[in-house]
């Protein structure tokens, strides 16, 4: 028996056309009644949908109708129920960010890929880094820094020369962005259970902004990041094309 499907599509015409065709063929129920949510778009829309539907605990299966499709399966209109029946599930825990801005407001957000700090002015940022309350780096002079999940390690983290992490690994990637001093410091692997804290040095002279999956906070004074294990995103992939295989392919491409 086919599973009840809810379709979610980005605003791109190709995604909307695909939704119309698939809904006519397989039906389309409200998301809170669905047994699986099929996402049509690219990785950006997939992340948006995962955040939006996280309280439903419904597995999500993406088909690429966008530009970047690392989290997506190949698009096909003909065999969707069969693909869903044999799809393999990956579970991803997001990061939780708390960041205080100069006006005293503490902002909270979740990130599936990474939380990043970036300079917001012409001068390099100066950051102090602590892990679980222990000072680890007195001063990092850089364009920024980020903390990445294994699922996000092939995105901005990899572009910043951070390591690709196996899915399911109990570590997070802490990666510097264009580090000037210490010159040779690129980052570190930290336990998934750790809380990473950044304190901004000279925040008025060297303003810094934070980003959690495109949720921006300006004029940051401090920021902490930890894995949110109470939230689990369930992603479905075609057999042999899960995140582990994609991570391997990325390293040899």
How should each PLM-predicted stretch be described?
Residues 17, 48-50, 71-72, 157-159, ...:
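Short glycine-/acidic-enriched loop or helix-start segments at secondary-structure transitions
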Residues 42-45, 66-68, 151-154:
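Short glycine-rich anion-binding loops that position phosphate/pyrophosphate groups of nucleotides
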Residues 1-40, 46-55, 75-91, 99-109:
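ATP/NTP phosphate-donor binding region
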Residues 109, 117, 122, 132-136, ...:
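ATP/nucleoside-binding phosphotransfer catalytic cores, i.e., glycine-rich phosphate-binding loops
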Residues 139-183:
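Gly/Ser/Thr-rich active-site loops/lids in small-molecule metabolic enzymes
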Residues 57-59:
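Proline-centered loop/turn at the N-terminus of a beta-strand
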Residues 68-144:
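Catalytic core of DAGKc-family lipid kinases
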């Amino acid at each position: 028996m086919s599973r009840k499907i809810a379709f979610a599509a980005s605003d791109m015409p190709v995604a909307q056309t695909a939704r119309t065709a698939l809904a006519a063929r397989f039906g389309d129920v409200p998301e809170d009644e669905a047994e699986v949510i099929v996402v049509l778009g690219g990785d950006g829309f997939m992340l948006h949908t995962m955040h939006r539907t996280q309280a439903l605990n419904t597995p999500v299966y993406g088909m690429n109708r966008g530009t970047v499709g690392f989290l997506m399966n190949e698009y096909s209109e003909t065999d969707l129920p069969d693909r869903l029946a044999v799809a393999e599930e990956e579970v991803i825990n997001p990061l939780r960010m708390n960041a205080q801005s100069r006006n005293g407001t503490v902002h909270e957000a979740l990130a599936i890929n990474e939380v990043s700090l970036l300079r917001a002015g012409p001068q390099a940022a100066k950051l102090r880094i602590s892990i679980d309350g222990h000072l680890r780096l007195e001063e990092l002079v850089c364009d920024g820094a980020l903390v990445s999940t294994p699922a996000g390690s092939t995105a901005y983290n990899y572009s910043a020369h951070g390591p690709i992490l196996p899915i399911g690994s109990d570590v997070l990637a802490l990666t510097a962005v264009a580090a000037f001093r210490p010159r040779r410091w690129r980052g570190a692997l930290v336990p998934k259970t750790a809380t990473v804290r950044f304190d901004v040095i000279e925040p008025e002279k060297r303003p810094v902004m934070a980003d959690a999956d495109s949720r921006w906070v300006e004029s940051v004074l401090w920021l902490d990041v930890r894995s949110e294990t109470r939230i689990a995103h369930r992603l479905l992939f075609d057999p042999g094309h899960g995140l582990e295989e994609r991570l391997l392919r990325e390293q040899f491409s």
